[in-house]
Amino acid sequence: MTDLSKEELLQRIQQLENENEQLKAVALQSLHTLRYNQSCSHSLQQSNSVNEEPLSLEEFKRYGRQMIVPKFGSLNAQKKLRSSKILVVGAGGLGSPALQYLCAAGIGEIGIIDDDTVDVSNLHRQIIHKSSLVGILKCESAKQSMKDLNPFVKVETYPERLTVFNAFEIIDKYDLVLDCTDHPAVRYLINDVCVLLGKTIVSGSGLRAEGQLTILNYDQVGPCYRCFYPQAPEPSSITSCSDGGVIGPAIGLVGVAMAMETIKLLTGTYTRENFTPFLASYSAYPLQQMKTFKMRPKQSSCKVCGDRPEITKEMVENGSIDYVSFCGHIDEKNPPLQKKYRITVQEYSSLLNSQSREHTLIDVRPKEQFEITNLPGSINLDWPLVFSKCDNDKIDLLLPQDITKADQLYVICRFGNDSQLATAKLIEAGYLNAKDIIGGLNKWSEDIDAAFPKY
């Protein structure tokens, strides 16, 4: 064998290294090809298992723009949507945009449960409804809009309230539930029934210009509503859209986000391995921002999904759990005032017409509402922001200087609730001639002055 020089040896080593790199590249390409073929075969098997029936040409054209998005999941994901059944509880500010986008996306069957009717005051935010359909059931109004939007989607309506008597029967038909309600008692009912049936919940809420959403009981490994809130909020802390107001696009954005999370759940974006409990929070003012917070996991002590659950299907169905009592409620039939401290709008109207007695009318609505409309001569003392937080011995500082504790005071608000609390506070402070006007400005508009704006 001829001895090689050092230079020749180096050349030979370089040649062998190049050949080795080429062999590695060929092997790697073969591995990629094998994995790709296996993936295609697996996807085809999944596709066939999801839905054997192919999409029509119109469906390809209708859903094509979403199917080509890489993270969506292509044709198989669309077939998953088409084979899915979802229930939307509430066709209001959250449910309206969620229903529209989920219908447009091609969900196979959508159930809507809502016993309320469309009102003019709904239309600025509940955009699935039309002016021409004011007065009809919201679920039927939504169904009409959805059938016009996408005839491929089956829509089932339930013009009733969700109760312990019908919840299991209705929810059991569906793969997933969207909680678009605004009442704590219904939220707890939806949560308990879904946990006991093994259903995932997409839950949203919104008020004024803020909202939030989360996923509950994900695949029976994620936390439920009771994990987050084992105790119900105080009834006095709950503000409705009619009392607190709501900006349409703000709550609509939350509803759209709920639709997006629903699509991700149905198409398999989330798995038991990658799912992390979260709360997404949106605020429109002063600058729009969406923040996502990591939430605590499923709680072993939870009464419905924990290690030793106390709540059972039988308990819910037979009424052993009183959701209204658990959440508490304000008893409007038993006002906090004696009858002698209250007058009707008719009595106050007669007093104005007679002009027989001087008095001061105190309007305790928030400043923004007072500026919308008010009765002539009334003064504004914001109950939620100012009046309710004032010590009794300092109330005289809020009132005009010429008012004495012997003067006649009448207190009014929008619906007659805050005015009762404000009147009681005035009486406690020594203003014994203070009286509440029953039913507030809403009642004034209905019974005395039809031209007075209701909002």
Swiss-Prot record:
Domain of life: Eukaryota
Gene Ontology terms describing biological process: protein urmylation; tRNA wobble position uridine thiolation
Residues at the catalytic site: 241, 413
Named cofactor requirement(s): Zn(2+)
Pfam families hit by this protein: Rhodanese, ThiF
Positions with a binding annotation for ATP: 93, 114, 121-125, 138, 182-183
Keyword tags: ATP-binding, Cytoplasm, Metal-binding, Multifunctional enzyme, Nucleotide-binding, Nucleotidyltransferase, Transferase, tRNA processing, Ubl conjugation pathway, Zinc
Residues that bind Zn(2+): 224, 227, 302, 305
GO molecular function: adenylyltransferase activity; ATP binding; metal ion binding; thiosulfate-cyanide sulfurtransferase activity; URM1 activating enzyme activity
Domain Rhodanese span(s) in chain numbering: 355-453
Broad enzyme group: transferase
Entry-linked SMART domains: RHOD
CDD domains, alphabetized: ThiF_MoeB_HesA_family (cd00757)
EC number in record: 2.7.7.-, 2.8.1.-
Cofactor remark from the record: Binds 1 zinc ion per subunit.
KW Cytoplasm (keyword) present: yes
This protein's pathway: tRNA modification; 5-methoxycarbonylmethyl-2-thiouridine-tRNA biosynthesis
Any one annotated GO CC term: cytosol
Localization, UniProt: Cytoplasm, Cytosol
Keyword Repeat: no
Family: In the N-terminal section; belongs to the HesA/MoeB/ThiF family. UBA4 subfamily.
Role played: Plays a central role in 2-thiolation of mcm(5)S(2)U at tRNA wobble positions of cytosolic tRNA(Lys), tRNA(Glu) and tRNA(Gln). Acts by mediating the C-terminal thiocarboxylation of sulfur carrier URM1. Its N-terminus first activates URM1 as acyl-adenylate (-COAMP), then the persulfide sulfur on the catalytic cysteine is transferred to URM1 to form thiocarboxylation (-COSH) of its C-terminus. The reaction probably involves hydrogen sulfide that is generated from the persulfide intermediate and that acts as a nucleophile towards URM1. Subsequently, a transient disulfide bond is formed.
PANTHER family: ADENYLYLTRANSFERASE AND SULFURTRANSFERASE MOCS3, UBIQUITIN-ACTIVATING ENZYME E1
Protein name per its UniProtKB record: Adenylyltransferase and sulfurtransferase UBA4
